[in-house]
Amino acid sequence: METRRMFFSRRNILKGSAASLAAAALGSSSAAFAQQSSAPTIRPLTGKMTYEEVRNRAREMMIPRCYVCPECNGRGPCIGQVPGFGGMGASRGFQANYDSLAAVQLNSRVVHGVHVPDTSIDFFGTKISMPVIAAPTGGTTYNMGGKLTEEEFVNAICGGCNKAGTLGAVADGIGDPLPVYEKRLQTLKEHGYKAIVGLKPRLQKDIIERMRLAEEAGIIALTIDLDSAGRAARATKGQTVEPKTFEQLKELVKASKLPLLFKGIMTPDEAELCINAGAAGIVVSNHGGRTLADTPGTAAVLPRIVDKVNGRCFVMVDGTLARGTDVEKYVAIGADCTLVVQSINTLSIK
């Protein structure tokens, strides 16, 4: 099958954002222990470790859950490793994310009057420095090797993202009991972090209970990754997750005063259902290829979904984001904002 390549001008992305987004979006901002360094060197944002030293440290702490490959494309030793950050089965869904994004190419525009690129956006009333937010990630014990405490992880992710001018995230991991989720929220409250929260499609009463806790913690927005109902981990004893009907989606939207985005949307018809249920937004995501094998890549399905949405809700996307140009591509083909997973998680190690 022929791969269609798409070309976009950076001039048309992010109100004239130029190549500096590549440096701003992931190279500096996603380092989870960020303290900005003005020196144009490869020293890290803390001034204590180089980027490669951080990656080596991450390998020590995350193998075999993640091997911190030079290029995170679903073709490394992590294939089929779930829990962890590998893709389901032969990891073709993970690989499709990488390949579909790689097929999008950028053209530069050199004749313009933009001297200071503005990459900031409004996220439900909160101005953030770029269309990049940490993706909610749970399970430091079973997804990340268990060598990082919950408090360390939340401080790293949310502290670094906030210093970079964007939002961190905490998650309600599918195998995490309620006290673990409460501990993460408590860390947010203690430090005053600005963040989003990702919830699992648990029983309605359990979701609403977690919504209330998130509201008390001062969260900016909520996501529910509906596709987690199809994960093997749903069989975890005492941690029930389930598919949601249209009526259940409407109930959840009404249950919280916070903006609610439904995650795991990969088709235009389900985007329409979410809009009709009253969702503030959707997240185009195949869960990193970790819920269903052989899914298409998110960059492949995003344009059709955006056409269907037609501005009626906020559209986010995730999938193998590793650098600022990846952000530019997703925004160019229609996303309002991106969620970054592994690049940020790796840089949280110190």
Question: Which residues fall in each region the model found?
Answer:
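N-terminal secretory signal peptides
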Residues: 1-9, 19, 26
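Boundary at the C-terminal end of the N-terminal hydrophobic targeting segment
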Residues: 32-34
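An N-cap/entry alpha-helix motif that binds or orients negatively charged groups
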Residues: 41-129
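Active-site mouth loops of central-metabolism enzymes
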Residues: 138-148, 198-204, 261-266
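Short hydrophobic alpha-helical runs that function as membrane-insertion/retention elements
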Residues: 167-172, 196-198, 223, 283, ...
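Helical hairpin unit composed of two closely spaced alpha helices linked by a short loop
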Residues: 345-348
